[in-house]
Amino acid sequence: MNAHPQLLHARTALYPRDRRSVAVARDLTRVTFADWGLTRRSDDVLLCVSELATNALLHGVPPGRCFRLDLSLDTAGVLRVEVQDSGPGEIRTPDVMPESERGRGLLLVAALSDDWGVRHREPGKVVWCEFRGCRPS
């Protein structure tokens, strides 16, 4: 018996540097949940996809470039979200003023997901988060 989970499903899409891309990425995630028979944690996943896609658009996608969304589900029920961009810059969770309406995206991702992180690559970076317990119904 193999002790390592195997990939069960995967879906990838590229999105242009356009504010409408966040909604389209969220829609793809919603359709993917339905296609894969997932219901648990959908609201958390959708919010994290929105936050990571928004961060990519605001801070990581140079003009004329795209960002990439990867969704994957393994046999252990771990759903992984990855957003890749080609822009420079470090990812950090900022100190946010209580009255500020911005700067909470990565704090939300950290709070809602079971794990998250950043992997640097040339060019750009991959910001990812994982959700356990996402088995098909």
Regions found by a protein language model. Give the residues of each.
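STAS-typified acidic loop motif
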Residues: 12-24
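Histidine-centered phosphotransfer motif of kinases
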Residues: 44-62
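Preference for short coil/turn "hinge" residues that link or interrupt alpha-helices
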Residues: 15, 31, 54-55
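Conserved beta-strand-loop-beta-strand hairpin that lines the nucleotide-binding pocket
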Residues: 1-12, 57-137
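Conserved short strand/loop->alpha-helix "switch" segment adjacent to the catalytic nucleotide/phosphoryl-transfer site
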Residues: 23-50
